[in-house]
């Protein structure tokens, strides 16, 4: 995912992870100490009201890292109460200059950069992604996101409006209020930054639920939020499970907005809960089955490497992964042969090893789910060209897997696998591939590889997706919005568009004695 990763292009694989490319990456502590494993409310650490805990597991070994406080409805209630108090008129947060909010976000980014090596190691320990990627990609994008929104803090404002009559009219961009934020496990630090940046820049307060699979880095950042100087109650972080803590946020009558990144199935549940409670506004960034279209005139070397990257990056655990690779028939055989060779050469192993390209899946549940999809693919007639099995005797490692001769009606071509399983489909004409690509309930992203500008423009307009990449994949920047069509979600994150979901527009009209132009 992400711009920093894509910038390396074909070097992102073996070449990015070579010794030469990693000279600037400090050596990790493979057993980083865990400092924060409780609930963060009002700038203080708390045990769960129930005193319950849950284990967070190292996916490379299957061993428990530590126990974490298990937040539930009562803990969410406490967090919402603290956030609401911090948002009261006259509070330090409400009276703070917008420019000072920006300085606090910049200070938070500085503290994250100070602790970058530790956070990258902790992310790798808890999530399983290669340490080099945690350090060079995820942390890099976290810093850029927070600093980008720090710059917006005093620049997203209303306007004066010349209405008829002796009146003066203007708009204010006001914070929504208490924002519930539920983040996923595939990019824990980055998704935290995507949510916190626009919310805090616009003056909101936050109650965040972190994924139970990967709570540790987000909780450590809570310590840095306090150190940066954010007032108590502005950010509250509750580790816990979706059906309990997550559901409590989505249905809470005193939460004004909820933002969720995760599966379409859970997104539906959250939208229903929001509507049946207080009609809180909702933004959803959900699943995808993104088409990656390789035209016959594409640069073959680049297309093969980018298609590999589009699917296998982050162990295939990307909502926008290029998981339907459509290849024009006259280059299909060569593309498949070269894609299989590239997958076979992919280095799977210890995520702290600088040579590793692919670590484990995040947990046993995902591990078994992906293996189940592989079996389904074989049973339904897709041709297994490489991989398909377990890649280590412990941990949740899966071999890089490629299926050929995939048909649109097969389960693996319709459902989000969220793992290192590439599906390659053949097409004849550009008109055909547009129809097939759009024949999906999802619409998060798409890509096209071609040297023909007319084809690129036609496809970028015809494809039903929130993001279309041309001759690249997973190029992200904090400046560009991201979000989906159809069942891939609603609303946008990042960029100026990402601020809209966190503000209310108020119109103020004043009677004046006499208007002069």
From Swiss-Prot:
Record keyword Acetylation present: yes
Highest taxon of source: Eukaryota
Annotated positions for site Transition state stabilizer: 186
Chain location of the short sequence motif SIFI-degron per the record: 9-24
Feature: transit peptide: 1-17
EC number(s) from the headed UniProt entry: 1.2.1.3
Active site, UniProt feature: 285 (proton acceptor), 319 (nucleophile)
GO MF annotation terms: aldehyde dehydrogenase (NAD+) activity; aldehyde dehydrogenase [NAD(P)+] activity; carboxylesterase activity; electron transfer activity; NAD binding; phenylacetaldehyde dehydrogenase (NAD+) activity
Pathway where it operates: Alcohol metabolism; ethanol degradation; acetate from ethanol: step 2/2
Signal peptide range: none
Subcellular location: Mitochondrion matrix
Residues bound to NAD(+): 262-267
Modification after translation, per record: In response to mitochondrial stress, the precursor protein is ubiquitinated by the SIFI complex in the cytoplasm before mitochondrial import, leading to its degradation. Within the SIFI complex, UBR4 initiates ubiquitin chain that are further elongated or branched by KCMF1.
Job description of the protein: Required for clearance of cellular formaldehyde, a cytotoxic and carcinogenic metabolite that induces DNA damage.
Name of the protein in its database record: Aldehyde dehydrogenase, mitochondrial
Provenance organism: Homo sapiens (Human)
Lineage, opening ranks: Eukaryota, Metazoa, Chordata, Craniata, Vertebrata
